[in-house]
């Protein structure tokens, strides 16, 4: 799999329809609060396609309880698209499970992609080195599309990325 994400977090709002594709299939978006190992909470946009297992689970949760506040285990893919010259990054949920007692891996991302541009390195005001990468991750469906996923590497990893990675290199 070229693009895999696993998240555990709390649904913050009710899914709202955000688009309909050419085939008439609707897409819904909601935000989830996902806690890092450090305790920092990230707010991530989750997109669910109509008539998928993930959508059906949300519909079931809505029937028997409240989606907002539900603890969800989400697996899916990172998706990107350009909207008015701004990169929109979201998680496309392939499966969702309500689980108030989940104790496994809570945040995991695995992507395999190609370096799109020369790796710039910069120093933060605190003196930390950062390399900003953009990976082109090919979708595994028949669309022949790619998602351009921004990634950050820190300190020694940033230095090695600058020294060793070239445009077109495939990394995981």
Regions found by a protein language model. Give the residues of each.
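Single-stranded nucleic acid-binding surfaces, predominantly the OB-fold ssDNA-binding core
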Residues: 1-172
